[in-house]
C-alpha cells in the first residue's frame, strides 16, 4: 500500500520484469544515450553505484507502457521522481495506485521511481513539430512542448517506428512514436 498524507491507498499490480544488458543496448541505440554506466560492467564497477544501472528513462517508458496496456489512458502531465537506481537483472514491479493516480517501480524493499499522472492525453503525431535548438533547459523545467526543441529529438525521431513499437508496444499503440521520442531524448 502507498501511504499518502495519512491515507493508505490500494495498489493494483501491473507487471514485473528484469532489465537486461540487451535491453540497455536496445534503448541506447534508440535514444543515443551510450553512457557506460548503463552498458559496461567494467566502467560501472569504478562508479559509486558499483554496477550497471538501468537508464532511468527506459524504466519510465516501461512503466508508461505497462500502464497504457491496462486501458487507463491518462497522460497529459507526468511528475516523475527517480528515487534509487535500478540494477541489471534485478526483479522490479510496476504498481499502480488508481485513487492517487500514481505508478511506482519497486522491488520488495525499495521504491525506485514514482510517477504521478494527471489529465487526458493531448499529444498527437500531427500536432508536433521538431526543430534544432541550442537552448539549455533544466529537466525539471521541461514540458512536452519544450522537449520538441532539444537537439537529440532529431536523432531519436529518425528511429524506425517498428523498432520503437517493439520496445514499447502499448505506449506506441496509444500515442505513437512522437511521445516516446520526446521522453527518450531526456535520457
Residue map of PLM features:
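HotDog/MaoC-like acyl-thioester-processing domains
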Residues: 9-19, 72-147
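Short, Lys/Arg-enriched N-terminal segments with co-localized hydrophobic residues
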Residues: 1-10
Amino acid at each position: 500500500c502507498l501511504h499518502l498524507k495519512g491515507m493508505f491507498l490500494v495498489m493494483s499490480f501491473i507487471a514485473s520484469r528484469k532489465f537486461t544488458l540487451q535491453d540497455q543496448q536496445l534503448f541506447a541505440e534508440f535514444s543515443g544515450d551510450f553512457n557506460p554506466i548503463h552498458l559496461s560492467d567494467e566502467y560501472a564497477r569504478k562508479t559509486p553505484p558499483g554496477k550497471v544501472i538501468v537508464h532511468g528513462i527506459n524504466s519510465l517508458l516501461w512503466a508508461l507502457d505497462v500502464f497504457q496496456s491496462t486501458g487507463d489512458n491518462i497522460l497529459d502531465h507526468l511528475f516523475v521522481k527517480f528515487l534509487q537506481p535500478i540494477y541489471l537483472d534485478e526483479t522490479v514491479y510496476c504498481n499502480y495506485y488508481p485513487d492517487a493516480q500514481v505508478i511506482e517501480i519497486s522491488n520488495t524493499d525499495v521504491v525506485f521511481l514514482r510517477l504521478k499522472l494527471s489529465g487526458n492525453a493531448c499529444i498527437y503525431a500531427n500536432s508536433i513539430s521538431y526543430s534544432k535548438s541550442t537552448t539549455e533547459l533544466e529537466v525539471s523545467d521541461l514540458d512536452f512542448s519544450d522537449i520538441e526543441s532539444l537537439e537529440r529529438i532529431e536523432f531519436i525521431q529518425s528511429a524506425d517506428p517498428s523498432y520503437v513499437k517493439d520496445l514499447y508496444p502499448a505506449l506506441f499503440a496509444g500515442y505513437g512514436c512522437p511521445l516516446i521520442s520526446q521522453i527518450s531524448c531526456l535520457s
